[in-house]
Amino acid sequence: MAKVSKRLKALRSSVEANKLYAIDEAIALVKKAATAKFDESVDVSFNLGVDPRKSDQVIRGSVVLPKGTGKTTRVAVFTQGANAEAAKEAGADIVGFEDLAAEIKAGNLNFDVVIASPDAMRIVGQLGTILGPRGLMPNPKVGTVTPNVAEAVKNAKAGQVQYRTDKAGIVHATIGRASFAEADLKENFDALLDAIVKAKPAAAKGQYLKKVAVSSTMGLGIRVDTSSVNN
């Protein structure tokens, strides 16, 4: 049996098993438990009352976190003409068209988000087998296929996160870093929750927000009392 580290033992002793914590207390505990030698991300999971096997109950979207993610996001944009200049002015790291597609085919994927204007999708579509598995394929549902690429770039740089239900009907997303103030993490949590609640499918029946948990990269998961969140 693997030995349990002193750090993990200390973390476990700070959390009551099976207890549901108010969201403010959960965030405080996550910050306290984030003792790794790097700035851990703070992540949240929402277990939703949807049937992800049905296409009309798959939740997907994006939201700009008011306090950002604490991460520098590199943005690549497929567009041309005036849109290309606007994307550069908005802060895009890479802007191109056929030339950018060639770079990607050559294995150069030094970016975190891909944005495309509608006219570029005929080119981007050829990159599905490269971008798709990496979660980089532009999609209008999350605002990454848009005629207003400049605004999309600004959103990505400002701390936009994408969310989507997995096969178990759970949404996983990052709401910041352990170095963030508790109030800032709570504000980001509320923004994400609000977006997910607004995205509730009409076909979803029964309790929508079933379980919530907050954790850090190397910390324990803290279960949240759903009655303590503003949904």
UniProtKB/Swiss-Prot annotation:
Gene3D superfamilies in UniProt: 3.30.190.20, 3.40.50.790
Disulphides: none
One Pfam family cited in the UniProt record for this chain: Ribosomal_L1
Keyword annotations from UniProtKB, A to Z: Repressor, Ribonucleoprotein, Ribosomal protein, RNA-binding, rRNA-binding, Translation regulation, tRNA-binding
CDD domains: Ribosomal_L1 (cd00403)
PANTHER family to which the protein is assigned, alphabetical: 54S RIBOSOMAL PROTEIN L1, MITOCHONDRIAL (PTHR36427), LARGE RIBOSOMAL SUBUNIT PROTEIN UL1M (PTHR36427:SF3)
Protein name as it appears in the record: Large ribosomal subunit protein uL1
Organism: Neisseria meningitidis serogroup C (strain 053442)
